[in-house]
């Protein structure tokens, strides 16, 4: 049976005809007011998460204001294009569900590490960014290949392995969040890092996020990040803490996307860590698409479900390739949008097309990314600390899908020790061969490889 025969195509609320928690199903076309309302909820739930990875990477690498503005704009634009590809489902590409795409946090740590190494080696901004985006294009093929052999990949990258890697990603990112809370790298250079006003501003944002997430009103919970950051921005203005930049910014009304704006290069030492993160991202995508299928009241088993999984993972890899071509960072499915589907009762993928169009339009206006750049570092840090802690906690949740017996505890302990140890004391590899140094220089790669190897050589314990 085709998808169209399984789903209603009229715009009548399904609750009127069957026992369902949904108001509009996958192929329904809600009236314009309901469509716009649901689309705005999706945008509020994801907007901060789309722009933050690009902002963190650009700030950590010390990119000029104009380059940062360009990359943030392209993050919004690419997320919109990627969402259309994921939702539309052309042939084998795409899940065909209301799966909104956005910039992935998983790549923040390895890209900052790789970019810093290139910068230390004397690379200028165009050379550094060309190498990062070129390596991302090559590494994204990993996810496309995995989409064709999902059954094999899931045997090697078990919940234990992927959970450990996600934990390392989250724990590595907490340092980035704390750096922003203290005032960022600029504050380090002028000896104002950790100033009481920075900690106060970040603390207010953090407290607001916690407070809003404890409210019974679901709309406040969905918009908690946006509300808290807006309040933090207003408080920063009142305290005279808005950043002042004398660097020139794009004055054009419309920003025309330029493929390969920085050129094309490859940084081979960064390839393996990025490939490993793409492997983990592919499994996260499986979980996100399964959750989307579930809240959309679609099958979570059988041929249609498997087709959507393969199409979704393939689209994820393709979208990350497209994102790199348009000079921004990898895309992945956003799990928070599943909460919006439950909140609104609208699973119609036509709402997703409206969200995608909103993202594209926002990305074409440089004024949006220009405003984002003026968010004070402590405001960003207060918000991202919650996000990064959540990533680490989600790794714990993934690991807990398997029995935490002696074997599992040993694998987790050794993998975390190796991954975090290499990150915290990189000189441990100073006498290692160059190939091994490149292989294990990333804590994510070191911990992930350790988890994969131990998972394969330690036989599972009998229950």
UniProtKB/Swiss-Prot annotation:
Coiled coil: none annotated. It is found in: Cell inner membrane. It catalyses: xanthine(in) + H(+)(in) = xanthine(out) + H(+)(out). It holds the Pfam family Xan_ur_permease. Its main location: membrane. GO terms for cellular component: plasma membrane. GO terms for molecular function: xanthine transmembrane transporter activity. Specific, proton motive force-dependent high-affinity transporter for xanthine. Belongs to the nucleobase:cation symporter-2 (NCS2) (TC 2.A.40) family. This is Xanthine permease XanP. The lineage of its organism: Bacteria, Pseudomonadati, Pseudomonadota, Gammaproteobacteria, Enterobacterales. The gene is xanP.
């Amino acid at each position: 049976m085709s998808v169209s025969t399984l789903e209603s195509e009229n715009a009548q609320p399904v609750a009127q005809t069957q026992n369902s928690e949904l108001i509009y199903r996958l192929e329904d076309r809600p009236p314009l007011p309901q469509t716009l309302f649901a689309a705005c909820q999706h945008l509020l739930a994801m907007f901060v998460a789309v722009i933050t990875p690009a902002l963190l990477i650009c700030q950590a690498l010390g990119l000029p204001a104009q380059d940062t503005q360009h990359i943030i704009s392209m993050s919004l634009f690419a997320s919109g294009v990627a969402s259309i590809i994921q939702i539309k489902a052309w042939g084998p590409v795409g899940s065909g569900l209301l799966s909104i795409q956005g910039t992935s946090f998983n790549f923040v740590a390895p890209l900052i590490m790789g970019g810093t190494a290139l910068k230390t080696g004397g690379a200028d901004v165009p050379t550094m960014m060309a190498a990062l985006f070129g390596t991302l294009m090559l590494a994204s093929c990993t996810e496309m290949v995995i989409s064709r052999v999902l059954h094999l990949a899931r045997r090697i990258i078990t919940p234990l392995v992927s959970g450990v890697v996600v934990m390392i990603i989250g724990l590595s990112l907490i340092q980035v969040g704390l750096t922003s809370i203290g005032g960022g790298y600029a504050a380090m250079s002028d000896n104002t890092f950790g100033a009481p006003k920075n900690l106060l501003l970040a603390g207010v944002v953090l407290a607001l996020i916690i407070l809003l997430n404890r409210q019974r009103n679901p709309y406040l919970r969905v918009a908690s990040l946006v509300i808290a950051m807006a309040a933090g921005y207003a408080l920063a203005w009142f305290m005279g803490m808005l950043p002042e930049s004398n660097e020139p910014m794009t004055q054009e009304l419309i920003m025309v996307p330029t493929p390969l704006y920085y050129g094309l290069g490859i940084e081979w030492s960064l390839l393996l860590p990025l490939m490993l993160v793409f492997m983990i991202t592919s499994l996260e995508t499986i979980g996100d698409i399964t959750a989307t299928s579930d809240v959309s009241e679609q099958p979570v088993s059988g041929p249609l479900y498997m087709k959507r999984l393969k199409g979704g993972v393939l689209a994820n890899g393709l979208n990350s390739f497209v994102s790199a071509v348009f000079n921004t960072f990898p895309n992945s499915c956003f799990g928070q949008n599943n909460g919006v589907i439950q909140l609104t009762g609208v699973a119609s993928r036509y709402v997703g097309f409206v969200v995608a169009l909103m993202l594209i339009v926002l990305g074409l206006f440089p004024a949006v990314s220009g405003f984002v750049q003026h968010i004070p570092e402590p405001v960003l840090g207060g918000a991202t600390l919650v996000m990064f802690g959540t990533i680490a906690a989600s790794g714990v949740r993934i690991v807990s899908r398997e029995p935490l017996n002696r074997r599992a505890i040993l694998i987790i302990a050794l993998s975390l020790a190796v991954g975090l140890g290499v990150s915290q004391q990189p000189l441990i590899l100073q006498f290692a061969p160059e190939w091994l140094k490149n292989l294990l220089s990333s804590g994510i790669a070191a911990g992930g490889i350790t988890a994969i190897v131990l998972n394969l050589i330690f036989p599972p314990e009998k229950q």
